[in-house]
Curated annotation (Swiss-Prot):
It comes from Setophaga ruticilla (American redstart). CDD domains: cytochrome_b_C (cd00290), Cytochrome_b_N (cd00284). This is Cytochrome b. Binds 2 heme b groups non-covalently. A ubiquinone binds at residue 202. It is found in: Mitochondrion inner membrane. The keyword Membrane applies. It comes from the Eukaryota.
């Protein structure tokens, strides 16, 4: 009898075990689609990014013009650029929903998978930041100046570190060229980390909405979840293409249509929408080092969630108190996002400070307390 190549070939066997014959829980919902959607986002960004890099020039005198040239003179250059810019937004929408799913259903108890996931988020944020600088518009330049300057808050070595990162005494040509190099490199680091993420995931298998072991009821990934994932792909790509074709600049900053000018500061410097919640936390502390620490903590706090899990139940499905807190946290992050887009004046300052305080309080204090109380109420 002939050998089944899919199951015996050294490379195909790995693909088969990850995407075809993978045993998956029979009851995972659409919230489990976002992992594969992130994979599609990553592939889309690498393909469109590669095509853009073929026409881009990483030089302060030419960068802005080269992006304009792409949109005007390159076949479908405008579409490739719009897909790449809006693809980043979809990447972040998917990753935030993916993390929210993990928090809600207790997926963070797969510690290795979760920790690699947080590192992936940090790498994605770094990639998006250096990428936003490349068109060399006003917001690109001033965003780079403001964010890189934060490193100067590090005691003793801060200023040296910033000048080393800039390659000079301000954001200039060396900064742009190294940011382009990093923006080209980091997506491939993300690919590598994704493979590690999947390797750890397949050690334990997927979690499920009930938060209980599902070894007694597994189904093959293909055809069940391949079909389910394809539906997600179609919906997400339809939304992405619609955004890129109808309102490509909806999520961008109009300030970036002006070439970078070190002599003119924009009235309101703010990052892209997906960083606004962290930016609001940074701004809400009236001290440079304190703000930088809070900014870092806003993401790094995710590393602590497995350690703060006090509930005897894994998922929040049967924990109404924790559910209320979870949705309060979601609303809180949305408020932070809104505050981050507003000028630094009353009442936004105090709203931002309250929202920042409640963000950390919910994650570090209220979640563990609510879980302990639920254990008591359920007599667990």
């Amino acid at each position: 009898m002939a050998l089944n190549l899919r199951k015996n070939h050294q490379i195909l066997k790995i693909i088969n075990d990850a995407l075809i014959d993978l045993p998956a829980p029979s009851n995972i919902s659409t919230w489990w689609n976002f992992g594969s959607l992130l994979g599609i986002c990553l592939i889309t960004q690498i393909v469109t990014g590669l095509l853009l890099a073929m026409h881009y020039t990483a030089d302060t005198n030419l960068a802005f013009s080269s992006v304009a040239h792409m949109c005007r003179d390159v076949q479908f250059g405008w579409l490739i650029r719009n897909l790449h810019a809006n693809g980043a937004s979809f990447f972040f929408i998917c990753i935030y929903l993916h993390i929210g799913r993990g928090l809600y259903y207790g997926s963070y108890l797969n510690k290795e998978t979760w920790n690699i996931g947080v590192i992936l988020l940090l790498t994605l944020m770094a990639t998006a930041f250096v990428g936003y600088v490349l068109p060399w518009g006003q917001m690109s330049f001033w965003g780079a100046t403001v964010i890189t300057n934060l490193f100067s808050a590090i005691p003793y070595i801060g200023q040296t570190l910033v000048e080393w990162a800039w390659g000079g005494f301000s954001v200039d040509n060396p900064t742009l060229t190294r940011f382009f190099a990093l923006h080209f490199l980091l997506p491939f680091v993300i690919v590598g980390l994704t493979l590690v993420h999947l390797t750890f995931l397949h050690e334990t298998g997927s979690n499920n909405p009930l938060g209980i072991p599902s070894d007694c009821d597994k189904i093959p990934f293909h055809p069940y979840y391949t079909i389910k994932d394809i539906l997600g792909f179609v919906l997400m790509l339809s939304l992405l293409v619609s955004l890129a074709l109808f309102t490509p600049n909806l999520l961008g900053d109009p300030e970036n249509f002006t070439p970078a000018n070190p002599l003119v500061t924009p009235p309101h410097i703010k990052p892209e929408w997906y960083f606004l919640f962290a930016y609001a936390i940074l701004r809400s502390i009236p001290n440079k080092l304190g703000g930088v620490l809070a900014l870092a903590a806003s993401i790094l706090v995710l590393f602590l969630t497995p350690l703060l899990h006090t509930s005897k139940l894994r998922s929040m499905t049967f924990r109404p108190l924790s559910q209320i807190l979870f949705w309060t946290l979601v609303a809180n992050v949305l408020i932070l996002t809104w505050v981050g887009s507003q000028p630094v004046e009353h009442p936004f300052i105090i709203i931002g400070q309250l929202a920042s305080f409640s963000y950390f309080t919910i994650i570090l204090v209220l979640f563990p307390l609510a879980a302990a109380l639920e254990n008591k109420l359920l007599k667990l």
